[in-house]
Amino acid sequence: MKFFPTRTLLCLCIAAPCLPAIAQNDPIELPDIGTVAGSTLTIDQELIYGDAYMRMLRNNQPVINDPVLNEYIDNLGHRLVASANDVKTPFTFFMIRDRNINAFAFFGGYVALHSGLFLHAQSESELASVMAHEIAHVTQRHLARSMEEQARRSPATIAALAGSLLLAIAAPEAGIAAINATMAGSIQGQINYTRSNEKEADRFGIATLAKAGFDANAMPQFFTRLADEYRYASKPPPMLLTHPLPEDRITDSRERARQYPPLKLAPHLDYHLARARIIARYAGIDADAALDWFARSEKKIDATLQPSIQYGKALVYLDLKQFDKAEPLLTQLVKEQPDNHFYLDAISDLYIELKQADKAQSLLEKALKQTPNNSVLTINYANVLLKQDKFTDAIRILQRYTHDNPNDINGWQLLSEANSRLGNSAEDLAARGEIMALQANWNKAIQFYTQASQLVELGSLAQARYDARIDQLMVQRERFLSLQ
């Protein structure tokens, strides 16, 4: 299924720790961060700030809401987390549409990857090395420790810094000014602390990488290539601004990687499928440029990875509505790997365009028997039902899906559309309210739920449910505003 990000990108690149997202219906405890005496951040406080940051990011940055890519980076990220030490909280991995090379982590369990990383990482191990580095920032609580270090210099720093980061997401000029003002007078200490954090994240990241079965040398290899490529650049990529690569850091990472046995890993097809999907849809290049890239790569890529080239070309043809070119490519790919979620997602879109949604439904039902409740398959299945005007069935599936995945905007968008087309105006408004809440647009969320409440029978269970949600949203709004 095809989804496109919206909004412009504010590049807030903070290499730091992360913790788990708060479920949207859970009560939020207001942290005691604003006091002058506060000099430490608890895990609970980090969770609250992280949830707030993520809601603002969804509103102000082009977060990629692509089910297939989300599944890929989530699986890869959690494979690494399973091998990391000192993991005390869940992780959430997401992507931002930006050709710049960067990744960052922040409060709340969130690790962000720029889509540009896939254009520069030459293997899954190299991508995993960046993710392992960010995971280490999380497990070692570098952002919290950095703020605590500042608090020892100025007692008000934690409250000011945490609030200014939220402002930076909402209004970059105000936030950056607030950060600069807060940290004035202690810059050199912060620089030294940041360098120490980077080396520590490298050390823990390489250990995680090796333990998870990836090539530990991928990290120094990626570092070396970046340093060589941008050594004399007047405008280096954001990653080199937030993650400086002095020679001693590269040398240190190389020496640490040598402590692990060298690995010769076969290229991983799913990584190259994800890369092809990004080039076709999220690289900011036109169709001709994408097809040219695939044509050049086809001549030099390993035979086992040729399916990624065919897949990438099929996506371009699909987006160009050249279905006669896309169909034979996707049909062959599905024949070779009938359970591959990249292929099933694309061929479902193709069958919808060809007015053959029943074929997509049959394929997805078969796949769901193998992996029930899978996010990629469920979202595509609901969409296929929707395109066949099977609104009641789609709503039933999406209600369960949004209950289990309350932070997935894709589910709420489809649920809103299904209810709208069925004429369930109140439920349509409620789903739209959840989308607004996920984007920190509290006033709009409350407005939609208020309208929903006014549409249903006075005193009904539906009205009670809507009114209870309004109360929750009002509390969340006030607590969110108090963090700024």
UniProtKB/Swiss-Prot annotation:
GO terms for biological process: chaperone-mediated protein folding; proteolysis involved in protein catabolic process. Zn(2+) binds at residues 133, 137, 198. The active site is at residues 134, 202. Keywords: Hydrolase, Metal-binding, Metalloprotease, Periplasm, Protease, Repeat, Signal, TPR repeat, Zinc. It is an enzyme of class 3 (hydrolase). Its EC number is 3.4.-.-. InterPro entries: Mito/Outer_Membr_Metalloprot, Peptidase_M48, Protease_BepA, TPR-like_helical_dom_sf, TPR_rpt. SUPFAM superfamilies: TPR-like. It is found in: Periplasm. Its cofactor is Zn(2+). Gene3D superfamilies: Metalloproteases ('zincins'), catalytic domain, Tetratricopeptide repeat domain. Coiled coil: none annotated. TPR repeats lie at residues 307-340, 341-374, 376-408, 426-459. One of its GO terms (molecular function) is zinc ion binding. Binds 1 zinc ion per subunit. GO terms for cellular component: membrane; periplasmic space. Residues 1-23 form the signal peptide. Pfam families: Peptidase_M48, TPR_19, TPR_8. Functions both as a chaperone and a metalloprotease. Maintains the integrity of the outer membrane by promoting either the assembly or the elimination of outer membrane proteins, depending on their folding state. Belongs to the peptidase M48 family. BepA subfamily. This is Putative beta-barrel assembly-enhancing protease. It comes from Vibrio cholerae serotype O1 (strain ATCC 39315 / El Tor Inaba N16961).
